């Protein structure tokens, strides 16, 4: 555990943080799903209005690549729990991405604790796929197996332990891009999705009170988790 880490604090402090930033937020949604080693929680600063969650290991690691295969079934359990609430009929696209941070000093991301972004949307799958492919294919994206959680196993096989990377998934099609020259822009996929879907991109590092109000309205659209019923 790192005392200065946003995600090492645990479920209680995560819930308190939601309460401090968003007084009208239903705190039953703050911990969407929890198991022994992982927490699923809403992204506190969602860049779009569709359901936007983070899957976070409780132990302090800097990427999902560093997790042993013994955790992969637990990861799949969280994804299944999200699907049951947010996509029970399979009509929405499920988008996942991660900025995997393994090298010291690389500014790929601002939070040095692994977190997998999970988004559910009815926005056109073809447009999302086209835009992502257009932006990342020049970086030699590597396809991973479709079945879960085997794509996590393949992630370990395709990457060296100290590789930084981008992981992107839509509808169980998974791609990984190695960062060969420390060139990934900060918040790359967050900016891309907001721009593509027509949402105002709000940089969580600089959000003012009015922008926090907008983010709070986006958060309030999230349905209650199964544990709240």
Where are these regions (language model features)?
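HIT superfamily nucleotide-processing domains
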Residues: 1-229
């Amino acid at each position: 555990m790192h005392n200065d880490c946003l995600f090492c604090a645990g479920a209680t402090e995560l819930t308190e943080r939601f309460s401090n930033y968003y007084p009208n937020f239903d705190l039953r949604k703050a911990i969407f799903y929890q198991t022994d080693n992982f927490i699923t929680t809403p992204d506190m600063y969602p860049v779009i209005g569709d359901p936007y969650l983070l899957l976070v290991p409780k132990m302090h690691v800097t990427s999902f690549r560093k997790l042993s295969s013994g955790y992969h079934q637990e990861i799949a359990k969280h994804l299944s729990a999200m699907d049951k609430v947010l996509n029970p009929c399979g009509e929405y696209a499920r988008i996942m991405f991660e900025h995997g941070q393994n090298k010291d000093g690389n500014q790929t991301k601002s939070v040095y604790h692994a977190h997998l972004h999970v988004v559910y949307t009815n926005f056109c799958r073809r447009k999302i796929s086209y835009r992502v492919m257009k932006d990342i294919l020049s970086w030699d994206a590597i396809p991973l197996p479709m079945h879960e959680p085997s794509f996590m196993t393949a992630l370990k096989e395709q990457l060296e332990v100290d590789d930084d990377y981008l992981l992107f998934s839509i509808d169980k099609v998974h791609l990984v891009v190695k960062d060969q020259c420390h060139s990934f822009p900060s918040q790359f996929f967050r900016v891309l999705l907001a721009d593509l879907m027509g949402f105002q991109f709000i940089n969580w590092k600089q959000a003012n009170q009015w922008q926090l109000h907008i983010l709070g309205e986006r958060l309030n659209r999230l349905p209650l988790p199964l544990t709240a019923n």
